[in-house]
Amino acid sequence: MHAKSLTELRAALAAKECSAVELAQHYLKRIDAARDLNAFVHVDADLTLAQAKAADAELARGAGGALTGLPIAHKDVFVTRGWRSTAGSKMLANYESPFDATVVARLQAAGMVTLGKTNMDEFAMGSSNENSAFGAVKNPWDTNAVPGGSSGGSSAAVAARLAPAATGTDTGGSIRQPASFAGVTGIKPTYGRVSRYGMIAFASSLDQGGPMAQSASDCALLLNAMAGFDERDSTSLERDDEDFTRHLGQPWAAGNDAGKPLAGLRIGLPNEYFGAGLADDVRATIDAALKQYEALGATLVPVSLPKTELSIPVYYVIAPAEASSNLSRFDGVRFGHRAAQYGDLLDMYKKSRAEGFGPEVKRRILVGTYVLSHGYYDAYYLQAQKIRRIIANDFQEAFKSCDVIMGPASPTVAWDLGAKGDDPVQMYLADIYTLSVSLAGLPGMSVPCGFGAGANAKRPVGLQIIGNYFNEARMLQVADAFQRATDWHKQVPAGV
C-alpha cells in the first residue's frame, strides 16, 4: 500500500480497496517501526485516526474532494492545534499553538489526514537536519548520510514511505536540497503563492512553503490545495486560483509527435551551474537526465547567471538579518523556554535565549545583529539587497532565451552525518545552486534523476528545474514528462 502514489491511493479509496482509517493505521505502523530514522518528532495516533474517521464519513456520504482521506506529514515549522509545534528547537519544545497554520488548515479542509510532525533543522537553519534539538535525521537510502535540510524529516519520511507526502519550507533550498538527497520530488512555489501565516518565521522575505511527494503529479495535487491568497499574510499574492495539474500528460505544444512531447521546450543551462565545485558523479547523472529531455524533444540552450557565486554572501547577510529580528520575540516571557534561575529581567532574557537556542541559530542571530548594527547597515545589508535585485534581473535576462532553467540541485550527493558540522562555510556552499532562486523569489523544484557513483552509488541525485514567476504548472508538466519516461521517482531504499 505504501508504494502507491497519492493518485493511486486516491483511486484505492474510491474503489473501497481500503478506508482512510486503514490507510492511516498502515502508515502509523510504518512510522513506529522506523523510529531509528528520527524523521518524526511528534505522532498522536488518536488525533490521526479521528481525522481519518471523519474522512471516511465524508467519503461514505459521497462527499469529499481529490485529497480526502489521504495521509500527509507536516514539517514542524507549521503550527498545528493539538500537536506540539517546536521548529526543531528547545526554545519551543513544549509549545502548543491555539490555531493551525494556513497550509495545515487548507490541507485539512481538503480532507487530508495528519500523520504527525516531521523533524527539521532548528528554526529551519541548516542543510543537513543535524541542527535539530531532537537529534539528527538519517537518510533512508544510506543511514550514514544526512537527508538534507532543513526539511530533512519530511524528505526522509517520504523517501522511506512513512508518508505518501509531506509539507516543507524553502528559505534558501530547504525543500529542493533534501528532496535531492532523499530521492523525492519537491517544489518551492513562487514567493507569495503559499501563505506563511502560522509558519514559524526564519527570514520573512525568503520563506515559502511547498509540497514534497513521490512525483510531480502528486506535488501538483497538493499545490492545488496549498496555494491561494490569505489576507492574514501580508506577503500573500492575490491571484486567481489555478489548477496545477492542467498541463500534466499534455505535449508542450499542440500537435507535437507522441514520441517528442516536449518539442519546442527550450531548457536553459547556466554555465555557472556546471563549473568548478560540481562533483563528477553528479555532473554525469545530470547530463544523462538532460539527454533524456533531448530525447523527449527539448532543446538545450546555454545561458548565464553571472552573479551565482554572490548568492551565498548575499543570502548570509539578508537571511540572518531577518532572523535576528524574527527571533527576538523568543525571550521566555509570553512563550518559549524560560531559564529556571536568573537575576533581573535582562538576565532572564540572556539565560533563556542562551539555553533555548542551538549553536547555528546563535551564530546566525549574531551575524544578523552585526549587519544591522549602526555603521554596518549600509555597507552590508543595503548592499546585499542591491545585489539581490541584480541576481533577479540575471534570471529575467536568461528567461528571454529559454522556458525553464535546469541544473543540479546540489553540487554533491548527501554527505556523511557529522562530516561538515565543524565547518559551517562548507555547509553553506552546499546551497550554491538553490540560494539564487530563493533570492529572486522564483519557483524551483527538484526531481530524482539517478544516483552518485562508487561509494555514493546508493545516494540520490536531484535535477533542479527553475521556472519564471507563476510558472509552476508548466514546470510540473516538464517534470512529469521526465517521470513518465523514467522510473527514478519510483525507486525506494532497500527494505522499504
UniProtKB/Swiss-Prot annotation:
Q: Name one GO molecular function term.
A: ATP binding
Q: Which GO terms describe its cellular component?
A: glutamyl-tRNA(Gln) amidotransferase complex
Family annotation (Pfam families)? Amidase
Identify the catalytic residues.
75, 150, 174
Give GO terms for biological process. Answer: translation
**What InterPro entries does the entry give?**
Amidase, Amidase_CS, Amidase_dom, AS_sf, GatA
For this UniProt record, the keywords arranged alphabetically read as follows: ATP-binding, Ligase, Nucleotide-binding, Protein biosynthesis
Q: Which reaction does it catalyse?
A: L-glutamyl-tRNA(Gln) + L-glutamine + ATP + H2O = L-glutaminyl-tRNA(Gln) + L-glutamate + ADP + phosphate + H(+)
Give the EC number: 6.3.5.7
Q: What job does this protein perform?
A: Allows the formation of correctly charged Gln-tRNA(Gln) through the transamidation of misacylated Glu-tRNA(Gln) in organisms which lack glutaminyl-tRNA synthetase. The reaction takes place in the presence of glutamine and ATP through an activated gamma-phospho-Glu-tRNA(Gln).
What HAMAP family is this protein classified in? GatA
Family according to the record: Belongs to the amidase family. GatA subfamily.
Self-association or partners: how does it assemble?
Answer: Heterotrimer of A, B and C subunits.
Q: What is this protein called?
A: Glutamyl-tRNA(Gln) amidotransferase subunit A
Quick one: which gene encodes this?
Answer: gatA
